[in-house]
Amino acid sequence: MLKLYKFTDAKKEYWETWDNDDGSHTVHWGELGTTGQSKQVKGSLLKKPEKIIQKEVDEMVSNGFRPIEEEYTLLIEYKIEGMGTKEDVEKRHRLQDRMSETLGWAGLGHCDGGSIGSGTMEVCNYVVDFEVAKSVIEKDLKGTEFENYTRIYHEEAE
């Protein structure tokens, strides 16, 4: 997977691509925090999909898109009893799956797992913009089984 970003005062954008199992590639782009658009790129007899993708990558780089080196650790924390229950662990796994989808399709980052014990349960995410990601997550969790979180916080700021 290749992820490129362009952050200006006016707009924050992402562009990413990944290989699919069938030999095609998916290209996904948009404004950071939105689902954006996507397309499938398939090769032909005369042109491999990698060449088509490389041309797009070159265009994006010439337009100011770059990989982002710095990611922020965003944690979603829940209060639990003691070391937690089987149901708590299952809920954490469902939330991890949801965050992988939510953050990935919004161009924000990915979920990296979680932890449980000593009265709290956390889901760990790596994101390129903490404030945008926090806002997207708050909206995504509202009205779901996951809305009862204690806090969403930036680990490095603690």
Regions found by a protein language model. Give the residues of each.
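A short, exposed loop/beta-hairpin motif centered on an aromatic-Gly-Thr core
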Residues: 34-48, 121-126
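Short aromatic-glycine-(Arg/Gly/Cys) micro-motifs in beta-strand/loop hairpins
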Residues: 13-40, 97-117
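Conserved short beta-strand edge segments in small beta-sheet-based binding/regulatory domains
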Residues: 66-67, 143-158
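Short glycine-/aliphatic-rich beta-strand segments at the starts of folded cytosolic domains
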Residues: 70-87
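Short, hydrophobic/aromatic-rich segments at coil-to-beta transitions
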Residues: 1-6
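Short, intrinsically disordered low-complexity segments
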Residues: 106-135
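A short, charged, amphipathic alpha-helix used as a generic interaction element across diverse proteins
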Residues: 44-61, 134-141
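Charged, amphipathic alpha-helical regulatory modules used
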Residues: 91-96, 112, 155-157
